Regions:
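Alpha-helix N-cap and loop-to-helix initiation/capping positions
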Residues: 84-88, 139-147, 187-195, 230-234, ...
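Substrate-binding cleft and catalytic face of glycoside hydrolase catalytic domains
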Residues: 52-226, 263-264, 359-364
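Short, acidic/polar
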Residues: 35-48, 148-158, 232-245, 330-342
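A structural motif corresponding to the C-terminal end of an alpha-helix
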Residues: 92-107, 158-165, 202-214, 245-252, ...
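Noncatalytic carbohydrate-binding groove/subsite architecture in carbohydrate-active enzymes
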Residues: 40, 166-167, 191-326
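Structural preference for beta-strand elements that scaffold enzyme active sites
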Residues: 28-32, 52-55, 104-108, 166-170, ...
Length: 420
């Protein structure tokens, strides 16, 4: 009778064959912008805000086809040819990435799979619930797994170009809320994480053939030791499983992409978050208690190979203005100022990619640096836009002083708390 004597082990990631060599894209500051789009204000805001990092959504099924359509680029992988909509790539990604690459901005692509179109249908997980906007990729058949690998290989090759570079990859969206965002049905957390880690590893191993500096990020919400929604998982449990799987099956350099919104998304006064405490057992991690993340990545057992700290991007984070009344707009700016002082002081936090650039109805509350980009508001800059601009400059201290009274503190000294 056969008996399993060890866990399966993945190939040594340090031995991945490199097809080319590109330089790393280091962060020049901790200030970034989330959800870049092709917009007339792109270059203005990248320059005026001093952006060093950014994210861009990569919805694979929007531009990948299994059969050729007019204007598609053919791409052969594993003996099969797939097709990619060239005009979509140019207008949605290339023109944006050309501007970020010219400025040395480190961009992370967020891999999303809507279950639409022929590629989306093939990539759809067999237990997808039919409701969530995105699906976990189907890696239960050779055909669908190869399709996903082909998409990753195409993207990795195209966007390892120094002139339109994606430096890192965020794997899906808020996977602690898989039931609502990256769906594969209602699964036990270990089953979900086993599948999710395969998606992460596939991306990591393929991308590292083109860019050995690239990191892959787990995307999670502000829930830490509490499920942030019905049917969700606890983030800390997911990270513990990441460590266990990595130890058993072979470690790789995965990193953390946290959505550290206030505990109550509609309340910008994050300094009052009662559920965000200075404890590793906190229910939420928000801009108030980023010290928790800073401590977590500083612990040896959580580090890559036990001694290399994993990156932390606040890849979708910010505060809202519940309305366009002056008080709400000023509270939003104060919430950012408070969070920025924490971010800038904590070595374990690599940066924030503010979400969102413009107010967006799909967010539920107005989170933008700018108002709605419609005929009425025309994307007008909000007070938080100017506060964001001043952050990290010689004008920061003088400009941020106006927010102390609103937050209820006399100075920024002593803001960082010890985590027992």
């Amino acid at each position: 009778m056969d008996e399993l004597v060890s866990h399966a082990r993945y190939a040594n990631v340090d031995a991945i064959h490199a097809k080319q060599s590109v330089e790393a894209v280091p962060l020049k500051s901790k200030k970034g912008l989330g959800g870049l789009i092709n917009h007339g204000l792109l270059t203005h805001d990248l320059d005026e805000l001093g952006i060093s990092s950014a994210t861009i959504n990569i919805p694979i099924s929007n531009f990948m086809h299994l059969s050729e359509q007019p204007g598609d680029i053919p791409y052969t992988y594993g003996g099969k040819t797939y097709y990619f909509n060239e005009q979509y790539l140019i207008s949605s990604f290339d023109v944006v990435l050309q501007q970020t690459s010219q400025r040395g901005i480190s961009v992370a692509g967020i891999l999303l799979i809507a279950p639409s179109g022929d590629a989306g249908e093939l990539l759809k997980h067999p237990d997808y619930n039919g409701v969530a906007p995105y699906t976990m990729p189907n890696m239960t058949t050779v055909e669908s797994t190869q399709c996903y690998a082909a998409a990753l290989d195409f993207l990795a090759q195209r966007y390892s170009d120094p002139d339109m570079r994606i430096a890192h990859w965020i794997i899906h969206n808020e996977v602690d809320g898989g039931i609502h965002w990256t769906n594969m049905g209602d699964k036990p957390i270990a089953t979900f994480m086993d599948t999710y880690l395969r998606s992460m590893r596939m991306c990591y191993n393929i991308v590292h053939q083109y860019d050995r500096h690239s990191e892959v990020f787990i995307s999670f919400s502000h829930g830490w030791n509490i499920a942030a929604g019905g049917g969700w998982y606890k983030v800390r449990d997911m990270l513990d499983l990441m460590n266990q799987f990595s130890k058993a099956e072979g470690d790789f350099f995965w990193s953390l992409a946290c959505h550290s919104y206030p505990a109550q998304l509609g309340n910008p006064c994050t300094w009052n978050d009662a559920q965000a405490t200075f404890s590793m057992d906190t229910e939420y991690v928000t801009l108030k208690n980023l010290e928790v993340l800073d401590k977590w990545v500083g612990i040896s057992q959580n580090q890559y190979k036990g001694n290399i700290r994993r990156s932390v991007w606040l890849s979708e984070a910010g505060t809202c203005s519940p309305s366009y009344e002056d008080k709400d707009l000023q509270d939003q700016a104060a919430g950012f100022a408070y969070g920025w002082k924490k971010i800038n002081a904590l070595d374990g936090i690599n940066g924030i990619q503010w979400h969102s650039w413009f107010d967006h109805l799909g967010d539920g509350v107005p989170l933008g640096l700018r108002k709605y980009s419609d005929e009425e508001y025309k994307g007008e800059a909000k007070p938080v836009w100017t506060t964001y601009q001043k952050a990290g400059t010689d004008e920061e201290d003088d400009y941020f002083e106006q927010y102390l009274e609103r937050i209820g503190i006399e100075s920024w000294e002593g803001l960082i708390q010890d985590i027992p």
